[in-house]
Amino acid sequence: MYSEEFATDPHHAYREMRRQYGSLVPVELSPGVPATLVIGYHTAVRISNDPDHFPADPRTWQQSVPADCPILPMLEWRPNALRSAGLEHARYRQANAAAIDGIDLHALHSAVEEVAVPLINTFCEDGAADLISQYAFPLTFAVLNSIAGCPPDIGQQVAYGMAAMFEGVDADKVNAIFGGALFDLITLKRAEPGDDITTRLLAHPANLADAELINQLVTLYGAGIEPLQNLMANTLLLMLTDPRFAGNVPGAAPSTKDALNELLFTDPPLANFSVTYPRQPTLIDGVWLPAHQPVVISMSACNNDPAIHDGDYTDNHSHLAWGTGPHACPAKSVAYLVANNAIDQLLDALPEIRLACSADQLVWRPGAFHRALATMPVVFPKSPPLTVF
């Protein structure tokens, strides 16, 4: 799952897994790191909604993992909602949900436009761009910083730490980058509170300690920068390569919303995640799952499970791209709004945009968890800068 071959065509790998193993597949997340990949939809829903038998706390597993394991930064225990269970999880989850629910979605719509237009203006006169480095990443980065109340200098270190985490860089290095940057942000927000997630976390009755605050923000950025950037880019790829989205017949072409819904089903940006650790050996679908070994939900494979997949994505929200159960994403409406608005801004500004190469020449970044393009080169007629109001 960490190979370039898997990154190039994971769906072929999932089909072979299903043919050979059924709903539960023995895999390695990294060399010498065994896990079980769940590729059956109904099995995934069952496991995700059974936190008593499948908790998300990895501490027992972590004791057997070398400190230099490249996926440790992604999976190690942190005092946050993603990597905890029971009352601990409930406390963190309540604080996170309250902080996210305080986001003004109308203001967020305007914030996306305020970021998107200047970004488009940096390349619209060139007639060519890389939509990953010049649009999807910087837009996601700027919007996440705005939501968190994070100034650009601190945010730059956070972004570097997130990229290192998803690429499997040394855990101590990742944590040092994160810890320093996010502690600086917390210190700033104590002195200068604002209408942002960090301030709301600081003010929440859970009375989170600094280490806990830092790790709630790790979750915010971890679930924000890489997955949201990839949601935008992969949806744009679908819209630029699938004739259904060409818009040649007025009023008949599917919308950006339709493309997002389809992409979340067929090729979600966070392809394999929602990791849990059985408390004891557990029999599921005729397979014994070892105690304290990672059980990873393949949102991508489960969404494409022939048992539930009928090809109809219209207003169908039964996919697992946001997860399900007590660890489901609490910010899906925020992510969906940002991606939808960012894509619409780009396509409205550059309606004749197209890929600069064939889709099969695009390179997908290796990694067990994400579905991420390395670059996305596009061309379009040169256009004058947009007016910023």
Protein language model features and the residues they cover:
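Cytochrome P450 core scaffold surrounding the K-helix E-X-X-R motif
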Residues: N303-G311
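Cytochrome P450 catalytic core segment centered on helix I
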Residues: A148, Q157-N207, A211
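Conserved cytochrome P450 K-helix E-x-x-R motif and the immediately C-terminal K′/meander segment
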Residues: P250-V287
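Cytochrome P450 heme-thiolate "Cys pocket" and heme-binding signature region
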Residues: D310-M376, P384-F389
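Cytochrome P450 catalytic-core helices
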Residues: I214-Y221, I225-P250, P330-L350
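Active-site substrate-recognition loop segments, prototypically the cytochrome P450 B′-helix/B-C loop
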Residues: M1-I132, F141-A159, A163-M165, D172
